[in-house]
């Protein structure tokens, strides 16, 4: 997806809040915007 691995790591190594879809750091326990605790890792591959 990205042109070089550093950019891909910056874009894809995040967690997504299941409540408000905010981007959070990988080591986050709760969402930085809404405080929700259910976070998922961002999908690494496209569905299409």
Curated annotation (Swiss-Prot):
**One GO term of the biological process aspect:** translation
Recorded superkingdom: Archaea
Q: Which GO terms describe its molecular function?
A: structural constituent of ribosome
Which SUPFAM superfamilies did the record assign? Zn-binding ribosomal proteins
The protein's matches in Gene3D superfamilies, at most eight in alphabetical order, are given as: 4.10.1060.50
A single cellular component GO annotation = ribosome
| Pfam families to which the protein is assigned, alphabetical | Ribosomal_L40e (PF01020)
UniProt keywords, alphabetically: Ribonucleoprotein, Ribosomal protein
Family listed: Belongs to the eukaryotic ribosomal protein eL40 family.
Which PANTHER family has this protein been placed in? 50S RIBOSOMAL PROTEIN L40E, LARGE RIBOSOMAL SUBUNIT PROTEIN EL40
Designated name of the protein: Large ribosomal subunit protein eL40
User: What species is given as this protein's source?
Assistant: Methanospirillum hungatei JF-1 (strain ATCC 27890 / DSM 864 / NBRC 100397 / JF-1)
Q: What is the lineage of its organism?
A: Archaea, Methanobacteriati, Methanobacteriota, Stenosarchaea group, Methanomicrobia
Q: Which gene encodes it?
A: rpl40e
């Amino acid at each position: 997806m990205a042109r070089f691995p550093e950019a891909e790591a910056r874009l894809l190594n995040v967690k997504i809040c299941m409540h408000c879809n905010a981007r959070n750091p990988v080591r986050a326990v709760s969402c930085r915007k809404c405080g929700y605790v259910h976070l998922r890792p961002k999908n690494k591959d496209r569905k299409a």
